[in-house]
Amino acid sequence: MYIEMIDETGLVSQEIMEQTLDLLNFAARKTGKDEKEMSVTFVTNERSHELNLEYRDTDRPTDVISLEYKPESPILFDERDLEENPDLAEMLSEFDAYIGELFISIDKAKEQAQEYGHSFEREMGFLAVHGFLHINGYDHYTPEEEKEMFTLQEEILTAYGLTRQS
């Protein structure tokens, strides 16, 4: 999986960047999404607040914002298009590979790690996997959806070695 990592805060250690990258690749393999592409941006609470207001109309910072990429309309082409532009099929497959982007608030991750009594590393991993599942179509609006998503989320984190005691 190709993952673009961006640290807008300048506060994320190389270890956390590498753990996030490794964990998301692990999650991608576990869910059959390893041929996809996404981005992860680490932000402050201030930036998280702005994004939450812009995309979710919620006037407060949040821990992770998941923006699933869904093309507005299908791309239609015919055989003649492929004959005229042999690179078109490859370009479209790359376009189809992009699944979305995550914005993780470093400030919220630190607050929540302390609140829940586990490590910052565990909280960062939790937020990354939670967001990853959202951009892959999982949600928790109903009890059934919540059970499915949270079970898979915990399976991934445990198999990776990031337990609540981590």
From Swiss-Prot:
<feature type="binding site">
    <location>
        <position position="134"/>
    </location>
    <ligand>
        <name>Zn(2+)</name>
    </ligand>
</feature>
<keyword id="KW-0690">Ribosome biogenesis</keyword>
<protein>
    <recommendedName>
        <fullName>Endoribonuclease YbeY</fullName>
        <ecNumber>3.1.-.-</ecNumber>
    </recommendedName>
</protein>
<feature type="binding site">
    <location>
        <position position="140"/>
    </location>
    <ligand>
        <name>Zn(2+)</name>
    </ligand>
</feature>
<keyword id="KW-0255">Endonuclease</keyword>
<dbReference type="GO" id="GO:0008270">
    <property type="term" value="F:zinc ion binding"/>
</dbReference>
<dbReference type="Pfam" id="PF02130">
    <property type="entry name" value="YbeY"/>
</dbReference>
<dbReference type="GO" id="GO:0004222">
    <property type="term" value="F:metalloendopeptidase activity"/>
</dbReference>
<keyword id="KW-0378">Hydrolase</keyword>
<keyword id="KW-0540">Nuclease</keyword>
<keyword id="KW-0862">Zinc</keyword>
<comment type="similarity">
    <text>Belongs to the endoribonuclease YbeY family.</text>
</comment>
<dbReference type="GO" id="GO:0005737">
    <property type="term" value="C:cytoplasm"/>
</dbReference>
<dbReference type="InterPro" id="IPR002036">
    <property type="entry name" value="YbeY"/>
</dbReference>
<dbReference type="InterPro" id="IPR023091">
    <property type="entry name" value="MetalPrtase_cat_dom_sf_prd"/>
</dbReference>
<feature type="binding site">
    <location>
        <position position="130"/>
    </location>
    <ligand>
        <name>Zn(2+)</name>
    </ligand>
</feature>
<dbReference type="InterPro" id="IPR020549">
    <property type="entry name" value="YbeY_CS"/>
</dbReference>
<keyword id="KW-0479">Metal-binding</keyword>
<dbReference type="GO" id="GO:0004521">
    <property type="term" value="F:RNA endonuclease activity"/>
</dbReference>
<keyword id="KW-0698">rRNA processing</keyword>
<dbReference type="GO" id="GO:0006364">
    <property type="term" value="P:rRNA processing"/>
</dbReference>
<comment type="function">
    <text>Single strand-specific metallo-endoribonuclease involved in late-stage 70S ribosome quality control and in maturation of the 3' terminus of the 16S rRNA.</text>
</comment>
<keyword id="KW-0963">Cytoplasm</keyword>
